[in-house]
Amino acid sequence: MDPNCSCATRDSCACASSCKCKECKCTSCKKSCCSCCPAGCTKCAQGCICKGASDKCSCCA
């Protein structure tokens, strides 16, 4: 169980330590969401890449 995820390892959760997912149900949380995405980002599951600022990333900019 990753401390930053609400799923158990048997659910194929592989979050990175920098990921702040609340509901990780994917195989690689690092690629499907990121802490820099603003709340309500509907594209957060399309491979975000953070770009520095806490509210900027490749899919929500």
Swiss-Prot record:
SUPFAM superfamilies reported in the protein's UniProt record: Metallothionein (SSF57868)
Biological process annotations from GO: cellular response to cadmium ion; cellular response to copper ion; cellular response to zinc ion; detoxification of copper ion; intracellular zinc ion homeostasis; negative regulation of growth
Where is a divalent metal cation 3 bound in this sequence?
C15, C19, C24, C29
Residues annotated to bind a divalent metal cation 7:
C50, C57, C59, C60
User: Ribosomal protein: present as a keyword of the record?
Assistant: no
Disulfide-bonded cysteine pairs: these are none
InterPro entries hit by this protein: Metalthion_dom_sf (IPR017854), Metalthion_dom_sf_vert (IPR023587), Metalthion_vert (IPR000006), Metalthion_vert_metal_BS (IPR018064)
Entries under Pfam families matching the protein: Metallothio
Q: How does it assemble?
A: Monomer.
Q: Which family does it belong to?
A: Belongs to the metallothionein superfamily. Type 1 family.
Comment field on protein domains: Class I metallothioneins contain 2 metal-binding domains: four divalent ions are chelated within cluster A of the alpha domain and are coordinated via cysteinyl thiolate bridges to 11 cysteine ligands. Cluster B, the corresponding region within the beta domain, can ligate three divalent ions to 9 cysteines.
Any idea what job this protein has? Metallothioneins have a high content of cysteine residues that bind various heavy metals; these proteins are transcriptionally regulated by both heavy metals and glucocorticoids.
Protein name as it appears in the record: Metallothionein-2D
Native species of this protein?
Answer: Oryctolagus cuniculus
